[in-house]
Structures are given as structure tokens and as C-alpha cells.
């Protein structure tokens, strides 16, 4: 690649830019002279310190040490995972140039949108082609087909010569979307960027990325779509919000996708800071599954003692004998691991294991469940989003745990009934007493079904 292919649309540290110099024909110039020719800004300004990459201003999120020259040096802790942004150094930021319009459509997807999907898709395209590109919120229930819903927008932006990024806070979501996006736009070379990915950055028309990787982007995209916008870590990260803002070109279109908008998004909608398009029904026209609630007593105490208490044991035996892949959600990692260990002798005919966010074999285990090599996966909330399994059965143990919010309960429940040939399934919430989040989730699931029914979007009552 040429030097500009590495730098365009990016915000890089001095160390990263020096690596570009080493690996390109820029080596023909003196490093200092070449660096001085590039547009740049201070990596940190202050004190009080402000990070030029992520916008961090929290004095607790900076670290000062004594450099080799005896002078104090400060760096940002908020975006440290992508390399140090340090005082006395510079950031090199270059906007991406305009892209080239395409002569023919890059969309190879042969599917068909439902009328309600098509209506929202058309509104997004009209917003892109209009004079005022106000931020858009697509509030579509789990299983509504929100990824396919944005295909016409992607097609139009790409045809017009724009660059598009579909970003998500979760690696699992990116890995779920990657094959679908590549199949839908088979003529384009779509790059997938996340920590540890095989793809390296190039200036391409279509990018799939984690929101963390956007910390390296600068005015790179004409259209930026953030999927699962209410998910951790994006939802609570000022740095990632800043990364999204900076990655979008001036005048670009920002679209948020979620099934469970948080209070901030709803407030922005009510205040007119964004436009909301709501889709309260799944693509197959069946209602969202509602949970069966079951009191199971003090199961954490039993688990800590190395046993499954009788009510829980009986329920999990029944759950294990259900057809199809099974997800057993457990609030905390030690509980998930202990539960999987106790389930193996209880359900000897099943292939099962546990999984969590820091599990190095996480992707292998998810793939094994997809392929039928695993029957049951005991999981934390890491699989509440971005995993679509036909005929999936779900049991949420400790549904009343304070870790579980209204949104997380709805997302976990949303793994059930996503396929048209089996639009329902087991959805069990096991608890020691109903929590406020449980009541809120049940209320919203019911309200969404009622809205869908009132709009004539459901095929069944």
C-alpha cells in the first residue's frame, strides 16, 4: 500500500506513524522531515490534561512518571489498550478522501424485506439523500432483522461513493455479522477490524469494526452505523462515544441500532436530537416470547456448597432434555463454571461446558454449539447479544440478580424463537423473588407485542 493508504481516515500515535515510515517508501525521507510534513496535533494538552485521541479529561485517568531525561511524562489511561498517548508527542490525523461512485449495485443479497422493514429502510435512504442528515435511531425488537433492514442504506451510500462502517461494542456481534455482510455484498472486499483480527486497516468502502477500533479513525466514514448501541462497554464509555463522533465525516449520517434503547437515547429522541424509527415486531410476524417464571430458592448457597438444590435440579433436568441448542445464563463466572461441573453428571448424555468473556476458547465453543457438537452452553451475559441459533432454548438462572437489567433480560430472552419455522421455544426465568428489572422487562415485552398487534404486524395473537 501507499503511504496515504495507511494514514487516510486515521488518527495515529507517533509510534504508529513511525512504523508506517519504516514499512513504506517514506523511508527515502528523513524521519523528522517526513513527520513535520504530516498534519498533526498535540497528543495531550494541559494540564489540566485532555487526551487528543479519546477526549478523556478525568484527572484520575492519567498517569505521570519520570522520563529517561528526568522530565515528567503523562499518558492517558482511558485508551491505553490501543497504545500510549503521551505528553510531548503528537497525533497524526488525516481525513479520508472522497470515494468513487459505483457503476452498479454492490448488493448481492437476494432476500426480501417485510413491508415494515422496507418502510424504515426507505426512510433511512431518504435521510442519506436529504439535506439534513439528523442522527437516526432504529429501535427494532430482537429478531426483527435490523441488519438486513440497513442493506438498502449501505447500497445507496456505496453507490454514491461513500464509505460505510458498521460498528459494534462486542467482538461476538462483529463475528456474527461478518459472514452475513460479506455474503450480502459479495463483490466488495469487506474488512473486519477488532483486537486480534487477521485483517489490517485499509481504506475500503465497507468496514465492520468494534467501537474500540474507531479510536484510530478520523473523519473516515460517510455513514456510520452503531449496532447494539446500548451494550457494554460503549454505553458507559465517553471515549467510545467520542471515537464514533470523530470517525464520522462532517455532514455524514449516524445510525444507531438496538432492541433495548437506554434512557439517554430515549431522552435524545424526546428532545428531538435524533429521529427514531420503531419496529416492534419480528420479521416472521410472531410475538416476542414471554418468560415462564419459576421460584427456585437459595440456589447460590447450594452451588457454593457444591450441589444443586432440589427445585433447581429438577428444572435443569427438564431443560436439558429439550430439543435444540440450549443456553443457560448464569450471572457470575464462578457460578457458571460450578454449574457446568455439576450438570455434567446430572445430564451425562449431553455435551456441555461453560463460557465467559475472558475464555480463550470462547469462539470455538460458540461454533461447537452452532454445529451441534455441544448441546448446552452455560454462559454469562457475554452471549446476550449477537448470537442467533435456530430452535434455541433459554433458561436464565438468577433472573433477579442485580447484575441483570431490563435490557439484559430482554436481550437474553431474545435468543428464543428467532427462526420462522420455530418462532417460539422454552424461556424460563428462575429466581428467588421478582426484581424490578424483571417486572420492567416483562412489561416492555408485553407492550411491544401490543404495539405490534395494534399496527397489524403480528400474524398470530
Describe the residue ranges of each PLM region.
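Interdomain "pre-motor" coupling segment immediately N-terminal to P-loop NTPase/helicase cores
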Residues: 39-100
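Conserved strand-helix element at the start of the C-terminal RecA-like helicase core
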Residues: 137-147, 157, 162-177, 315-344
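Conserved interdomain linker/interface between the two RecA-like ATPase lobes of SF2 helicase motors
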Residues: 138, 273-340, 350-352
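Conserved helicase motor
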Residues: 168-176, 180-182, 190-202, 209-216, ...
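Post-DEXD/H (motif II) to motif III coupling segment of the RecA-like Helicase ATP-binding lobe
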Residues: 219-297
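A short beta-strand element within the Helicase C-terminal
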Residues: 221-227, 376, 384-400, 410, ...
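Conserved SF2 helicase motif VI
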Residues: 235-249, 402-425
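Conserved segment of the helicase C-terminal RecA-like domain
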Residues: 249-264, 413-444
Amino acid at each position: 500500500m501507499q503511504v496515504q493508504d495507511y494514514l487516510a481516515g486515521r488518527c495515529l500515535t507517533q509510534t504508529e506513524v513511525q512504523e508506517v515510515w519504516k514499512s513504506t517508501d517514506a523511508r527515502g525521507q528523513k524521519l523528522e522531515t517526513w513527520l513535520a510534513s504530516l498534519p498533526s496535533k498535540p497528543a495531550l494538552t494541559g494540564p489540566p490534561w485532555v487526551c487528543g485521541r479519546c477526549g478523556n479529561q478525568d484527572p484520575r485517568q492519567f498517569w505521570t512518571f519520570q522520563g529517561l531525561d528526568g522530565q515528567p511524562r503523562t499518558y492517558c489511561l482511558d485508551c491505553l489498550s490501543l497504545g500510549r498517548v503521551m505528553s510531548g508527542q503528537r497525533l497524526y490525523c488525516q481525513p479520508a478522501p472522497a470515494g468513487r461512485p459505483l457503476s452498479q449495485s454492490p448488493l448481492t443479497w437476494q432476500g426480501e424485506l417485510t413491508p415494515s422493514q422496507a418502510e424504515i429502510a426507505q426512510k433511512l435512504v431518504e435521510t442519506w439523500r436529504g439535506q439534513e442528515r439528523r442522527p437516526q435511531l432504529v429501535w427494532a425488537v430482537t429478531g426483527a432483522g435490523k441488519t438486513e433492514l440497513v442493506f438498502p442504506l449501505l447500497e445507496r451510500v456505496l453507490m454514491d461513493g461513500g464509505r460505510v462502517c458498521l460498528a459494534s461494542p462486542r467482538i461476538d456481534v462483529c463475528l456474527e455479522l461478518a459472514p452475513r455482510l460479506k455474503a450480502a455484498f459479495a463483490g466488495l472486499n469487506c474488512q473486519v477490524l477488532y483486537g486480534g483480527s487477521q485483517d489490517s486497516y485499509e481504506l475500503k468502502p465497507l468496514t465492520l469494526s468494534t467501537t474500540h477500533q474507531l479510536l484510530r479513525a478520523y473523519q473516515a466514514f460517510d455513514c456510520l452505523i452503531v449496532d447494539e448501541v446500548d451494550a457494554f462497554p460503549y454505553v458507559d464509555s465517553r471515549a467510545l462515544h467520542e471515537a464514533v463522533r470523530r470517525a464520522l465525516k462532517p455532514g455524514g449520517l449516524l445510525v444507531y441500532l438496538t432492541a433495548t434503547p437506554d434512557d439517554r437515547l430515549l431522552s435524545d429522541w424526546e428532545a428531538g436530537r435524533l429521529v427514531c424509527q420503531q419496529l416492534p415486531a419480528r420479521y416472521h410476524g410472531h410475538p416476542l416470547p414471554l418468560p415462564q417464571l419459576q421460584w427456585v430458592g437459595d440456589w447460590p448457597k447450594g452451588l457454593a456448597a457444591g450441589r444443586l438444590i432440589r427445585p433447581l435440579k429438577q428444572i435443569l433436568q427438564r431443560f436439558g432434555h429439550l430439543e435444540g441448542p440450549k443456553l443457560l445464563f448464569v450471572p457470575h463466572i464462578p457460578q457458571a463454571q460450578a454449574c457446568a461441573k455439576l450438570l455434567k453428571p446430572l445430564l451425562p448424555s449431553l455435551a456441555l461446558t461453560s463460557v465467559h468473556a475472558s475464555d480463550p476458547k470462547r469462539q470455538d465453543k460458540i461454533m461447537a454449539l452452532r454445529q451441534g457438537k455441544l448441546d448446552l452452553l452455560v454462559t454469562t451475559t457475554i452471549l446476550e447479544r449477537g448470537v442467533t441459533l435456530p430452535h434455541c432454548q433459554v433458561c436464565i438462572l438468577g433472573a433477579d440478580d442485580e447484575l441483570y437489567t431490563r435490557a439484559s433480560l430482554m436481550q437474553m430472552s431474545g435468543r428464543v424463537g428467532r427462526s420462522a419455522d420455530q418462532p417460539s421455544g422454552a424461556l424460563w426465568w428462575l429466581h428467588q423473588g421478582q426484581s424490578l428489572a424483571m417486572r420492567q422487562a416483562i412489561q416492555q415485552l408485553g407492550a411491544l407485542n401490543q404495539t405490534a398487534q395494534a399496527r397489524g404486524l403480528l400474524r398470530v395473537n
